[in-house]
From Swiss-Prot:
Superkingdom of origin organism: Archaea
Enzyme class: ligase
One term of GO molecular function: ATP binding
Keywords: ATP-binding, Cytoplasm, Ligase, Nucleotide-binding
GO biological process: gluconeogenesis
Enzymatic reactions: (2R)-2,3-bisphosphoglycerate + ATP + H(+) = cyclic (2R)-2,3-bisphosphoglycerate + ADP + phosphate
Protein name: Cyclic 2,3-diphosphoglycerate synthetase
Chief place where the protein resides: cytoplasm
Length: 435
């Protein structure tokens, strides 16, 4: 790597002499003109005043792209101001630069990217725009879809994950309720994502720990690097990295899948969500059946990432096991419990009660005591193992795990798109502009 260059963003709301004065003091190598004409006659006036190369375009992101391609930029200094650069545009700029590993500095802010990790095994990175949007369900779906053609390992990084990377051989063993209770009684979080993925995908998983998440989605602390080495020791043909909440693995994978909830609406244009959107080769919009016009969120996504393959989906309950007799449904929210109950009843299952309090152990215990049932249908989340499953086993109840299968509502085929992404990655390493 050569000399690390510094670029400045300047505008026409400042007099050209003021811009030149600031650029000389900060020892800037080149600049991008971002708009504003109040203090200048034309952009030529600015060019004549400056002693460095100036880039400009009606689309400031095209100008930035060109400057970055022609120079080894490692730092961008924002010398503009409102009204030229609004907070929304500045967050878009931050997203644009962080994706490329470039630091973005303003008068009272600094966005510094975590270093992207490159690995020598083909990989897909699944990232999300928040918690409870169905990211783990998508991770399991991707895992079981790809295992039809490849040896797959899923690497997770949860807030309840193990300090040392932990392997669960979902490809070699059955994940039973008894096994999970045994894990829980040893003081481990048996509902962590790597257990859930091993259960729902039937592949080997590596569970890692992370703590803290930044605005862009990078973690403060994690054991991901060790997890990568453990995953590679399993000799996978493809590794799937699965994010945690709105945070994600800082691995520069050949393919990215971004998971967005349709319920988030315009929120995805705010702050640094555009970074996550811009990374996606595939963008899976979950819960699209719960909004009146899911096409609106597709339009928002296209504004940020016009090249993405967008899939509008709904979740359909996928039961792992057979239901017998009267059933009770236990999930992480009352709304999801109601939706699942209705769909299962439509399938002929006799649901006599439900709870959406997996994340509230006290309420969950109280609710389960009030209902008489034969089969517990439960998500592997939060208090599932140490409360719901343990109680059901003590009472001799049958336990069926509840997963969610994404179903397209837009006449597209998510399964085939996931396979096609993997084929591109495995066959040609998925290289593309911006990676």
């Amino acid at each position: 790597m050569g000399y690390a260059m510094r670029l400045a963003l300047i505008d026409g709301e400042h007099y050209p002499d003021v811009n030149r004065w600031a650029l000389e003091k900060l020892k800037v190598d080149c600049a991008v003109f971002v708009g504003g004409m109040e203090k200048i006659g034309s952009i030529r006036d600015v060019e004549r005043t400056l002693s460095i190369k100036l880039y400009y375009d009606e689309d400031i992101f095209k100008a930035l792209e060109r400057a970055i391609e022609e120079n080894e930029i490692r730092e961008v200094i924002d010398l503009s101001d409102e009204p030229v650069l609004t907070p929304e545009i500045r967050f878009r700029i931050a997203s644009f630069l962080l994706k490329r590993g470039i630091t973005y500095i303003g008068a009272d802010f600094e966005f510094k990217p975590k270093e992207w990790i490159k690995i020598d095994v083909p990989s897909i990175n699944i990232i999300g725009t928040g918690k409870r949007i169905g990211k783990t369900a998508i991770g399991g779906f991707v895992g079981r879809t790809l295992k039809e053609e490849y040896k797959v390992v899923i690497v997770t990084m949860g807030r309840g994950g193990p300090e040392s990377p932990e392997v669960i051989r979902g490809d070699l063993m059955e994940i039973t309720p008894e096994f999970l209770v045994e894990v829980s009684e040893k003081g481990r979080h048996a509902a962590s994502d790597h257990f859930e993925d091993a259960l729902t995908a039937g592949v080997a998983t590596v569970g890692c720990r992370r703590c803290g998440g930044g605005l862009a989605g990078f973690t403060f602390l994690d054991v991901l690097q060790k997890g990568i080495e453990v995953a590679k020791s399993l000799n996978p043909e493809i590794i799937v990295f699965e994010g945690s909440g709105a945070s994600f693995a800082n691995v520069l994978s050949e393919g990215f899948i971004t998971v967005v909830s349709a319920l988030q609406g315009k929120e995805i244009k705010m702050y640094l969500y555009p970074l996550r959107i811009s990374l996606g080769d595939l963008i899976v919009v979950t819960m699209a059946d719960e909004v009146k016009d899911p096409g609106k969120i597709s339009s928002l996504i296209k504004e940020i990432n016009p090249d993405a393959d967008i899939h509008l989906t709904r979740f359909s309950p996928r039961l792992i096991g057979n239901v017998e007799g009267k059933a009770v449904v236990v999930t992480t929210s009352t709304n999801s419990a109601k939706r699942v109950t209705k769909e299962l009843e439509d399938r002929g299952i006799d649901v006599v009660g439900f709870s959406g309090n997996l994340a509230n152990r006290v309420k969950l215990r109280e609710e389960l005591k009030k209902v008489s049932y034969d089969t517990l249908i439960v998500e592997l989340k939060a208090g599932a193992v140490d409360v719901a499953i343990k109680s059901a086993l003590r009472s001799g109840k049958r336990i069926v795990f509840l997963d969610y299968e994404p179903k397209n509502i837009d006449d597209k085929d998510l399964r085939e798109s996931v396979k096609e992404l993997a084929r591109r990655i495995v066959n040609d390493k998925g290289h593309r502009k911006g990676r």
